[in-house]
């Protein structure tokens, strides 16, 4: 009996993720020609996208996460743009445990939109769109560059969610 080794299962270990403190800078300081502005995290790097005018990625190097942002001019196609944004959200619905929605209305800035929290092991943890309903439409979605695991990525998701909420609440058309 003394020669027999007893196997003991070992628990899975995960990296400890520490999220940085954040400060914000106006997006328009770096990109004054864009038709929108919002508060941008000082921990993020804006990557311009040449697929379409005014498309950007907001990359968080310390978290290896990206907020993919697209902009479209509204040309009597608001319903189509809104439906496309909703399609992107609900493509993840089979993996989401729930998708709470939060409406945003800032009449003084003519900004109206919806924020979606995709809970569970989804590729995108948070998405939103905002519009003025006549000229501008902006959509964004958050992605981490790793397999989705809501439990281990919870600190990252919460940090990015707070940044996205700050984006939406400070969003303005120019």
Regions found by a protein language model. Give the residues of each.
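Surface-exposed amphipathic alpha-helical segments
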Residues: 44, 141-174
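Signature of long, low-cysteine stretches enriched in small and polar/charged residues
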Residues: 83-139
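Secretory pathway targeting signatures of secreted, lumenal, and periplasmic proteins
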Residues: 31-87
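C-terminal motif of bacterial Sec signal peptides marking the signal peptidase cleavage site
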Residues: 1-2
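Second-shell loop/turn segments in exported
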Residues: 67-76, 127, 150-158
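Solvent-exposed coil/turn segments that connect beta secondary-structure elements
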Residues: 63, 74, 121, 145-147
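Post-signal peptide N-terminal segment of mature Sec-exported envelope proteins
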Residues: 11-32
């Amino acid at each position: 009996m003394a020669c027999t080794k007893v196997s003991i299962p070992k628990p899975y270990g995960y990296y400890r993720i520490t999220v940085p403190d954040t400060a914000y800078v106006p997006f328009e300081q770096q990109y004054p020609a864009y038709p929108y502005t919002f508060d941008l995290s000082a921990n993020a790097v804006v990557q311009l996208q040449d697929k379409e005018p005014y498309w950007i990625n907001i990359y968080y190097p310390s978290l290896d996460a990206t907020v993919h942002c697209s902009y479209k001019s509204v040309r009597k196609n608001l319903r189509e743009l809104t439906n496309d944004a909703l399609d992107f959200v609900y493509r993840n619905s089979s993996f989401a445990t729930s998708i709470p929605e939060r409406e945003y209305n800032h009449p003084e800035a003519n900004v109206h939109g919806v924020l979606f929290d995709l809970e569970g092991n989804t590729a995108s943890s948070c998405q939103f769109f905002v519009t003025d309903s006549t000229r501008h439409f902006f959509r964004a979605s958050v992605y981490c560059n790793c397999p989705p695991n809501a439990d281990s990525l919870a600190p990252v998701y919460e940090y990015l969610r707070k940044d996205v909420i700050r984006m939406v609440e400070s969003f303005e058309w120019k």
